[in-house]
A protein has these predicted regions:
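NAD(P)-dependent Rossmann-like dehydrogenase/reductase catalytic/cofactor-binding core
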Residues: 103-155
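C-terminal substrate-binding/catalytic lobe of Rossmann-fold NAD(P)-dependent oxidoreductases
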Residues: 1-123
Length: 155
């Protein structure tokens, strides 16, 4: 159990998936559900994600989208930005925190077990693993700083 972690997810994920209008974050309406658990792994977060989509997903296309994803950090060639921040793992037993969390200097997120999900009409499930410090707190702080400098928002 991680005290307040699930509450934090219910607050933060809709903001992350939302939009910005007139300088104000408009949270995505969801629906969302989260469970946070503590496991005996020193580093690495695992997310089991199930989505309901507007139409039946083409899983091969989803895999291509994962492999081809490039964000603003890649567009601007920020110094600490990976060329490929998301890595698709085709193995049936991957990703796993102990095996995948340190990928690409702890900055990559490994995604696998892309599959249909019956929980929703047009459902899809994935498993994602990232390093909670390298890709999380420390790595994101560095990327955000690089972005602010590159965009001329700080000197």
């Amino acid at each position: 159990f991680i005290n307040l972690e699930e509450d934090k997810l219910h607050t933060e994920v809709p903001k992350i998936l939302g939009s910005c209008k007139d300088g104000v974050i408009v949270p995505h309406p969801g629906p969302f559900t989260f469970t946070a658990t503590r496991v005996p792994v020193s580093d690495g977060h695992t997310a089991s994600i199930t989505l309901g989509l507007e139409k039946t997903p083409d899983l091969d296309q989803v895999k291509e989208l994962i492999e081809g994803y490039r964000g603003r950090a890649q567009e601007l060639s920020l110094p600490q930005a990976l060329e490929q921040p998301l890595v698709y793992r085709p193995e049936i037993d991957r990703p796993q925190p102990l095996l995948d969390r340190d990928r690409d200097n702890k900055m990559a997120v490994s995604i696998g077990r892309v599959r249909p999900a019956d929980a929703f009409e047009n459902g899809m499930g994935i498993i994602a693993v990232g390093h909670n410090h390298g890709r999380g707190t420390y790595g994101n702080a560095v990327l955000i700083t690089e972005l602010l400098v590159k965009e001329g928002l700080v000197g």
